[in-house]
């Protein structure tokens, strides 16, 4: 005997408990914002929270602090509402912010939907689109359809779905439609690029300038970006703006310097290591002789490892984004003077204004490429290092992005993953 309304009732009761703070056994911190929630719901909806609570000791699970440079409080609030309601509201909030938060939390169904939105937006803004009524060279990409992950009886009852997934409509006869590419950015990479990337193995990027030599202005970079990062297409529309500031000339680094950083670990042990080492920068005594050194792409300081460089970059991004604010004292929602869009806080409005002005304040010292958002620069740095820090625990194959590792595990080790999630 089935009770199709049971799933909807369960979500409704959990939502009421969260609003009242009843039986909430954890608190998620995003900047200064606090979100009480239930661990079971977070772990069921997010791979990030599942791994966090699985690896953390029992006494340190009450508080979870997310990276405020990637996840904004309004975006996480929308994702938290989705976990408890089965609905995702993208109104009055930049899709890029929701995509960044969903990628960080490994909520891949939301990642697919947000990328589809951005792809459709880019196609609508492309001046090369065919006129209405003209036959396109290729059929348009199908738009993901929301489907409930419940039994058929629950769909008849029109209840809010507990889990959602993006499903493509059945393929019609004729030439095959183009597919939405599965990019390798789903943990940190936050936007789009057409076409899949082929995995290539490169040695670490070691530059050939002597350590004691002075930098020469106008020198050509020795390492070029051979392919755009998946995150860089979110700035494609703004790159056409005539007000885009010129890129500074690239500055070569010293011999033996490896430019790069390592993505933040998802496990509890790595998070504890990051918290213990926060704020500690490498001095000249710590660098020591021998071994590859890492250079900061923003200030050119040297560090003994990519982990210490990651800590240093986080301090940079906190300084640049420290002007984050909430609603104005009079309670009026911040509004863009150019397009009239309203935002939940002035910080998101400031980020949105970059799409109009073309401002790209974050610049890679190695190749001179500029980015609108700090996390895009962090992910772009991996292009120079060719690092592959994400290793499959079952076959030891390594990947540059955690999204590649996720799809590899889902394709080749699906049975093992299901056994872990039980």
UniProtKB/Swiss-Prot annotation:
Record-linked SMART domains:
BTB, ZnF_C2H2
Tissue distribution is: Expressed in skeletal muscle (at protein level).
**Which GO terms of the cellular component aspect does the record hold?**
cytoplasm; nucleoplasm; nucleus; plasma membrane
Compositionally biased spans, kind Pro residues: 243-252
Q: Where is the BTB domain?
A: 24-92
Q: What does this protein do?
A: Transcriptional repressor. Specifically binds DNA and probably acts by recruiting chromatin remodeling multiprotein complexes.
Q: What is this protein called?
A: Zinc finger and BTB domain-containing protein 42
What organism does the UniProt record list as the source?
Homo sapiens
Q: Which gene encodes it?
A: ZBTB42
């Amino acid at each position: 005997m089935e009770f199709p309304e049971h799933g909807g009732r369960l979500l409704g009761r959990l939502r009421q408990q969260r609003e009242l703070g009843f039986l909430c056994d954890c608190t998620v911190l995003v900047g200064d914002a606090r979100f009480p929630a239930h661990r079971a719901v977070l772990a069921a909806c997010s791979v990030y929270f599942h791994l966090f609570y699985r690896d953390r000791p029992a006494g340190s699970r009450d508080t979870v602090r997310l990276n405020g440079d990637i996840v904004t409080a309004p975006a996480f609030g929308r994702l938290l509402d989705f976990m408890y309601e089965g609905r995702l509201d993208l109104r009055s909030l930049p899709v890029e912010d929701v995509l960044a938060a969903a990628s960080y939390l490994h909520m891949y169904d939301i990642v697919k939907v947000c990328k589809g939105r951005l792809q459709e937006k880019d196609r609508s803004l492309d001046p090369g689109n065919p006129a209405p009524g003209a036959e396109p060279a290729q059929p348009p990409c199908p738009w993901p359809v929301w489907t409930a992950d419940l039994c058929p009886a629950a769909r008849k009852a029109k209840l809010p779905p507990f889990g959602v997934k993006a499903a493509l409509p059945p393929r019609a006869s004729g030439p095959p439609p183009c597919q939405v590419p599965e990019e390798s950015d789903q943990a940190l990479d936050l936007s789009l690029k057409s076409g899949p990337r082929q995995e290539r193995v490169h040695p670490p990027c070691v530059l050939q300038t002597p350590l004691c030599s002075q930098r020469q202005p106008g020198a050509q970079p020795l390492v070029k970006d051979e392919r755009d990062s998946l995150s860089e297409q979110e700035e494609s529309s703004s790159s056409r703006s005539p007000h885009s500031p010129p890129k500074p000339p690239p500055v070569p680094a010293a011999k033996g310097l490896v430019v790069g950083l390592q993505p933040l670990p998802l496990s509890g042990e790595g998070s504890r290591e990051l918290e213990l080492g926060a704020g500690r920068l490498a001095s000249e005594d710590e660098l020591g002789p021998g071994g590859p050194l890492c250079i900061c792409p923003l200030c050119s300081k040297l560090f003994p490892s990519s982990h210490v460089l990651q800590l240093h970059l986080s301090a940079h991004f906190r300084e640049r984004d420290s002007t984050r604010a909430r609603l104005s004292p009079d309670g009026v929602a911040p509004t863009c003077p150019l397009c009239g869009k309203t935002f939940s806080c002035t910080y998101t409005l400031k980020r949105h204004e970059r799409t109009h002005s073309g401002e790209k304040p974050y610049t890679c010292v190695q190749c001179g490429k500029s980015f609108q958002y700090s996390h895009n620069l962090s992910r772009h740095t991996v292009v120079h290092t060719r690092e592959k820090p994400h290793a499959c625990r079952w076959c030891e194959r390594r990947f540059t992005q955690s999204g590649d590792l996720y799809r590899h595990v889902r394709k080749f080790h699906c049975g093992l993953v299901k056994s872990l999630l039980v």
